[in-house]
Structures are given as structure tokens and as C-alpha cells.
């Protein structure tokens, strides 16, 4: 991502007048520019698929019991989401502009300082030149901060060693990293590369929004403003609350809730490997998140509104109430 981003930055201009045409220029005139651009855009989608799988795996096997590692991971997730959001603004299409307008506007819900904060971030009274330039600057610097944080993430993981599916100590089963893990990892890397190249070479625009092929126009609002697919679940939670501040809080808490998970671990076992009821609830949570993702991409109309509200309630209820209580129930089942 950093490499493709670097090559894109060589040809991109962060000015409202030329940003859109510079992206067009990259796709049409730069050698393999189209490939670099779509690798970068779809690489972000692959990145998020890996992140979601990684977080899900951590939740399933109780890896969140390594507190420092887990909390840096939550911080990393926020940083990657911020980076992806700012990157989406750079092509300066309709969805770039209106996405930036809608999401930055959420900060105005903060009491007292809200409106000042939004104008400070915009660098003016609307999303304009100053906003685009600073987003480019932040989008360039954040990945390096993410890389540093990932290093610290690993540093803390190596304090304890990694977890395993059973949730028991791995010490007796440790083997050399090379050749065993290197070979195992090459398989995963090749499958990811296969998926990414297939996406980039066969349907590069599958996950994008056609509205972003229209240059940004402050006088014309697109009929349905929606973010990229990896933000839709959070967007659905935001929209399910009919109050601005409430929605913003729910949006932030939908990710921040991950930091609370270790303190809600009531089971006497670490992993879900031998806990069938918790397993069921975990997969219900996954289904709920997929439902939220679907709702986030739908218009705010009759059946979708109530489905989104129910899915949002279920999301918080599962994590905060149902799963901890079920864990206690499982403890009693095993007479522990």
C-alpha cells in the first residue's frame, strides 16, 4: 500500500482544480498507472478484509487477554480507518466531496466546540482547497505512523508470545519459524495476491461508487451518500439513531467497544474452542455485522430503518450483555 501510494503521489496533485484530472491522467497516461491506482484502491479493501478477520479471530480465541497488544490493535484500527477515509477524499469525485462533508460535519455534534472544530479541520467554511491539501498530507504521513504502531503491536505480542486456538500455553509445542511458518505464510500471501489481482484485473470498480467518476460539485448532492463497503456497518449504526450526537457516539463506540471486551470476559476458558454456546453467539454477531453492512448501503426507507435499528441494538447487546452472561452459564454447565 505504501509503495503503490508513493508512486501515485508522484503523479497526483492535491489541488481542487487538478486533483480529479490528475487521477484521470494517472489512469490514462502514466505507464501502468491504472494498475497502480486500482492496486492501491482495492488493496485497501483487502487490507480491511484482513483486519476484520484478524479482529474476529482475536475475539473468537480470546487473544484480547493480552491487553497491551489488543489496545494498540484497537488504536491501529482507528488509524487505518482515518487513513482510508482521507484517501477516499483525494480523487475529488462526487462521493469524495460529499463523504468528506458528511463525515467531518459529524464533529459539529460535539457540544460547545463542535462548529469551531469542524471549521478548523476544513480550513474554511466548507470542504475546499485547504481541506483537500491537508487530507493529502495526513493520508501520506499516517501509514508510516501505522507501520510504527504495528511494530509496537508486535513488540508487546513478543512479551507474551502468541495465543493459539486452544487458549492453552504453546510453550511445549513451539517450532522454528523458518521453514515451517514461512512456508505456511507463503500460502496465505499467495492466496491474498491471487484475490487482489483477480479483483484488480477483472472488476476493479466492483467495490467503488460510480458517483466518484463525476467530478466534485458542491451545488449537486448525490441521491445516496454512502462510504466504501468497509465503513457501512458503522454508517448503519450511525444512521440508526435519530439524534446527531447520539449517532456520533454510537459510531465511535461501535469500534471503541473492542477495548471493553477484555473486561467482559467472564468465562473460565480463554478460547471459544470448547464453548459451543459462545460459538453460536459469535457467528450471530458476524451475521449481525453483515446485516449492518447491507443496511448501510441501503436508502433510509421503511423496511431498512427498523432492520438497521434492531441490528444496531443486537450488536451492542451481544457484546455487552448476552455473551458475558452466556459465558457464566457455560461455566456452570461444566460445574466450574
From Swiss-Prot:
InterPro entries: Cyt_b/b6_C, Cyt_b/b6_C_sf, Cyt_b/b6_N, Cytb/b6-like_sf, Cytochrome_b, Cytochrome_b_C_euk/bac, Cytochrome_b_N_euk/bac, Di-haem_cyt_TM. The keyword Iron applies. It is a multi-pass membrane protein. Disulfide bonds: none annotated. A ubiquinone binds at residue 158. PROSITE patterns: CYTB_CTER (PS51003), CYTB_NTER (PS51002). One of its GO terms (cellular component) is mitochondrial inner membrane. Coiled coil: none annotated. It is found in: Mitochondrion inner membrane. Heme b b562 binds at residues 40, 139. The keyword Ribonucleoprotein does not apply. The chain crosses the membrane at residues 1-10, 34-55, 70-90, 135-155, 183-203, 245-265, 277-297, 304-324. It holds the Pfam family Cytochrom_B_C. Keywords: Electron transport, Heme, Iron, Membrane, Metal-binding, Mitochondrion, Mitochondrion inner membrane, Respiratory chain, Transmembrane, Transmembrane helix, Transport, Ubiquinone. CDD domains: cytochrome_b_C, Cytochrome_b_N. Its cofactor is heme b. Heme b b566 binds at residues 54, 153. One of its GO terms (biological process) is mitochondrial electron transport, ubiquinol to cytochrome c. Component of the ubiquinol-cytochrome c reductase complex (complex III or cytochrome b-c1 complex) that is part of the mitochondrial respiratory chain. The b-c1 complex mediates electron transfer from ubiquinol to cytochrome c. Contributes to the generation of a proton gradient across the mitochondrial membrane that is then used for ATP synthesis. PANTHER family: CYTOCHROME B. The cytochrome bc1 complex contains 11 subunits: 3 respiratory subunits (MT-CYB, CYC1 and UQCRFS1), 2 core proteins (UQCRC1 and UQCRC2) and 6 low-molecular weight proteins (UQCRH/QCR6, UQCRB/QCR7, UQCRQ/QCR8, UQCR10/QCR9, UQCR11/QCR10 and a cleavage product of UQCRFS1). This cytochrome bc1 complex then forms a dimer. Belongs to the cytochrome b family. Heme 1 (or BL or b562) is low-potential and absorbs at about 562 nm, and heme 2 (or BH or b566) is high-potential and absorbs at about 566 nm. This is Cytochrome b. It comes from Sorex arcticus (Arctic shrew). The lineage of its organism: Eukaryota, Metazoa, Chordata, Craniata, Vertebrata.
